Each structure stands twice: as structure tokens, then as C-alpha cells.
Amino acid sequence: MPTPSLPAGFDFTDPDIYTQRLPMEEFAELRSSAPIWWNEQVPGNGGGFHDGGFWAITKLEDVKEVSRRSDIFSSYENGVIPRFNNDIAREDIEVQRFVMLNMDAPHHTRLRKIISRGFTPRAVGRLHDELHERAQKIAKAAAAAGSGDFVEQVSCELPLQAIAGLLGVPQEDRDKLFRWSNEMTGNDDPEYADIDPKASSAELIMYAMKMAEEKAKNPGDDIVTQLIEADIEGEKLTDDEFGFFVVMLAVAGNETTRNSITQGMMAFADHPDQWELFKKERPETAADEIVRWATPVTCFQRTALEDYELSGVQIKKGQRVIMFYRSANFDEEVFEDPYKFNILRDPNPHVGFGGTGAHYCIGANLAKMTINLIFNAVADNMPDLKPISAPERLRSGWLNGIKHWQVDYTGQCPVAH
């Protein structure tokens, strides 16, 4: 297999790369020459890990295999987030094991079973009318403003309302939920340099635990009550478990859906033919293509619990493997014309919600409903939207985030190039 021609010292989790761009050419280079590639990291520059590097997994089938083999590849050992500040203490990585994303069976299996009660088609469907109404209000308010930051005025709002609605968070507390989720994920970005993500996480956990206490006293017909009350098998979430579940929702639900919405709109701005098609037909397939194109989580990692051969490459026990969803979603062997944004793409076996297996996104249906509703509302209320300036990217080696994007909702301003 040929050696990939990458610059010396190139690191696919380097947050400085993602401030400017997505390394799509480098991903394509790996897929063609070394789909499973050892990414060496110099001591002190491993984003909190001190093990010499990781295996970069770039093709869709390999990503799916790692996802499926949760008996071999652990989420618990080093957590799933592959990049922190270089000086993070090991105990600050290990504390994240309380969040379901970073668990293995049997703890993960038990929690997932309880939490899935809140994400049944019926539970998600109950939010539809409220979210439809909110989506229309959000788009109308943005249209009335004339221009502004699409991220803050449009993208942020509906995913936040979806999560808050699911949990029954009062309207007056919802902005706090948004602030905490931003602060927990922006720790590598200079905009959040003076924020302590641990403090934000602790505040959110305390808030969630109080909510659980309140619901225990005054149960209702809502997800919180369902999760903290025992089922027929006696299973329920403890207050601590519920607190960490809300942390996961605030990050995995709010942040990822928001970034899919922003980058979906950016894609429509770059592909006006697809926007015209969406406005006319509103195809159900659009949400999946938006998620594939955006791939809001660039990558997650696992750690090998034993030696394992993956597509002819020997992975050693204890080595980290990083699944680059961003690369897998543009795999030429899986997707016809992958660099074409095509809202009618069907089938669309993307891994924007994670690979198959135990950790597949539990809220995928809620995310897709939210995306469909907000784009319908944008098409109804500001069909001629145009960018004013280039988007401002989040500095992160794992989350594909957009912090700000100035747009003209009326389509009257000259377009930025």
C-alpha cells in the first residue's frame, strides 16, 4: 500500500486545522492510499493523551466495524472524545465515564434501555406540533430582523427547544441550557478561553438533579418522570444518572443538530439548484443528506481491549482508533458522487449519527424531525436568504462547529465571496 503524501507532523485532530477548513483532501488521500493510518503525535501534543498517537479510520465499512465491535473497542477506556487541551488532567478525562456515550456494556446497555423510553416514535411525535409552531416563529422573527447571525437567530433555537421540550424545561431556563452546552464544548476555542467547562457541566448536572427531585415529588406525563420512575422490572435512572443524561442531551442533541442546520443552510447557499428543489418538493430525504454533508461530529474514538486485525491492519491492545465520520461520509466506494450535495440521495447510509451498533444516536429521529421543520420554516418565511460573510468556524478537533454566520434574510445584500 502506498504511503500517503501528508505534511510532516500532520495530525487529523489538530484543532487549528479545523478553525480554517475541513481536511477533505487529506482524508481522500488516506482513503485511497492508507485507509487505516497510524497518526503519530509528538509528546505533549496529544490533546490530553500520552500514548504516541492513534489509528485514523477513514472508510465507512471500517468505521461501522469498529462501531459494531463494542466488545473489542471500548468507549469507556479513554472516553470517546479524542481531543482535549494538551494539559488536561487524566482524572478530568475519566470523570466523563459517567456520561452514557463513554460507557461500555453492561452499564451502557442498562442505561440505554431506560433512556430509550423517552425516544419512542410516540414520545418524539408528541413534540411535532409544538416544534412546528416554534420553527415558524423562529423563521418569522429572523425574517423581520432583515439580517443577522443565522447560528444564533435560527440554528440554535429549535434544537434547544426540542431538547428542552422533551425534558419539560421551563421557557425562562432554556437560555441557560444553551449557554452551558456551548461552554462545555468550546473549551479549545479562544472565544470560550475564560470559561471552565467543568463548572458549566456541574451547573447543568445540579440543575438536572433538581428537576429530577421536583418530578419525583410531582410526577407528570413527560420523559423526566418516565426515566426516574421504576418500570415493571424495577429499572430507573438515579438522580446522578439523570444529571449526566441531561449533559449528554445538551451536547449530543443540541450542538450537533444546530451545526447540521447551519451547515445545511450553507450547503443550500452554495447549491442554489438544491434550494430551489427543496422549496418546491420538501423531500423527506433532505434531512439525511444535510446530516451527511454537515457531519457535525468529525470523529469519535475507541480503545482496543485486545489485539485485533481490522482490514488487514494489526491494532494492538491499548491503542486508540479514531473513527473519522467526516471521511467515511464521503467514501467514494459507498456514495455515488460523494462531493455532490444531493437532497434526493437514496439510499444514504451515512454515519452522521454514528456507526451502527450500541452507540448509534438515540435521538436520530428527533434530530431529523427538527431539521425538516426548521428548513420548511426557512423556505416558507425567507426563501431568498443569502450569506453576507463567511462562516466563523469553531476551534475543535472533534466537533464540526460553526460559531457565527452573518446572513441577509431578505436576499437583498450583495453576496460575500
State where each predicted segment sits.
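Cytochrome P450
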Residues: M1-H417
